[in-house]
Amino acid sequence: MSPADLALLEPSLKRVALPLRMPLVTPDVPIEAVYFIEHGIASVVARTPTGQEAEIGFIGYEGMAGYSLVMDDDRSPLACYVQLEGEAMRIDAACFNAALAASPTLRLFLLRFVNYLQVQTGCTALVNARLRLAGRLARWLLMCDDRVVGIRFSITHEFLATMLGVRRPGVTVALQELEGLALIRSRRGEVVILDRPGLVALASGGYGVPEAEYSRLFGELDSAAQ
């Protein structure tokens, strides 16, 4: 983002905590604010009318929640909530829209992120259709690793099941498979990555395309850059 565009946003930005499960976007409700995530991870989630849900988008320090406003839409049918707690810079929707109106370059810059997220969502659809659960889990853990400082993070089997759109016993079996391959160590509520290259191999090409697109548009996607 250019210094001039950042200067448009800065007076209205406020640092806020992102507790676990905090809703950032509620489906079909006007978006109240945009969150530029600094630490933590948010999930973009699709829901059925009966309440079943699955993660279709994954946002960390590289992105923002409330991106529909960039496309001149004030709401989304998709939910977005915090899956790993952290912090964000929050700006009210009205102030954000005013900044977009004042600077065409700001909108163009943020549309790059929307493009990247579309690529990520497309790859999620591909791996959900073509990869075994263990490979899908490996990809998900790699995406977490890109956005979290350190090699361990707190996550429950139940939450992983929701994110991957599967039953909890399936997640347990997949975690055991990854642990048997010495790729991770799993304890109640915590996963530690032991062999990142091994996870990349198990993801069978499902990981890497969105990350390369992000690098092309913005630079390297790496938790060390936070």
Language model regions located:
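Cyclic nucleotide-binding regulatory domains
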Residues: 22-84
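A conserved hydrophobic position in a structured secondary element of the catalytic/binding core
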Residues: 1, 37, 59-60, 83, ...
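Cyclic-nucleotide recognition modules
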Residues: 57-115, 119, 123
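Phosphate-/nucleic-acid-contacting segments
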Residues: 143-226
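Polybasic "coupling" helices that flank or enter modular domains
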Residues: 83-85, 100-168
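Regulatory nucleotide-sensing modules
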Residues: 1-35
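Conserved phosphate/pyrophosphate-binding and hydrolysis machinery centered on Walker-type P-loop NTPases
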Residues: 30, 127-131, 192
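Alpha-helix/helix-capping structural signal
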Residues: 4, 39, 94-95, 158, ...
